[in-house]
Structure formats: structure tokens, C-alpha cells
Amino acid sequence: MEVGVTLAQEAKTQAMTHTESRAHFAMWAVTSAPLILDLSIDLADASVVEANWDIIANREVICVSQTWSGHPGYLVKSANNTFVAACVAWTCENHTLPEYQIWAKPQPNGTFAVLLVNIDATGPSGLTNLIVPLSELFPPRDFRGG
């Protein structure tokens, strides 16, 4: 997981914006991946800690990560509309990506944590009234015998 990566810290990859870092942290949480902070808060540059504290200390995101209800988060919906992301890192190629993805993670009492990831920097088209059929969140099951 990367939060607060700047070009000066990692020359081989493109730096993530604060918004991208927030989304990345949330993705790790919703997929139940371990949240490991590779930063000694007492030894780190105070400006790095301050700039990212709202991400790494977000109690709600950490709670989603730490809550286990039998299943990690899963992809519910991926946009049909795509865009081409031009890669600026020296080892990377352009990629066709969906404009957005919706992820869900089961929580206690039959609730779900839902994460909308806006992948396209210009904003997804037609996302003002997003409809996700319940059958996509809750796959139908036949509980009758057999």
C-alpha cells in the first residue's frame, strides 16, 4: 500500500495525488488486505505525516479493514465506458481502464461497506444517477431444499 509517495521518494513511479492515496488506502481496506504503514511516524519528515494523517488515521476506513464478516470485498460493478490512461513512468505502457468501479465488503448485521472508485481523472460520464441492481450486490440464491 502506498500513501504519500512523492517523486523525490520514488523516482521509478509516478507520484500519487492525495486523492489517489485516499482511494488506494480505501481499496486496501475494502479488500481486507493488511494495512501496513511503511513509515516511522516518529522519524519521518513531519510534513509527510501531516499531509497524510487524514488518510492513515481514518477510523472508519480502518474499521472497514478490520471487520471480518466471512468474505473480503469484491468487485460489484465495473463501468462499460473506458478510457486510455497514458503512463508517464519509464517502464509502463498505456492501459485501457474502466471509468469507475464499485466494490462491496460484507459487514456485520447484513450490511455492506461500498466503495466507488473513480478511475478516470476527468470524472465518469453518467454517474449522477448510478443504479446498481440489488442482484449485483446480493447474488440470488435458491434456499429451497437440494
Predicted features by range, described:
Residues 28-38, 91-140:
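Carbohydrate-binding surface patches
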Residues 6, 57-61, 139:
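Generic surface-pattern signal
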Residues 26-93:
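Catalytic cores of secreted or luminal carbohydrate-active enzymes
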Residues 1-40:
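Glycan-recognition surfaces
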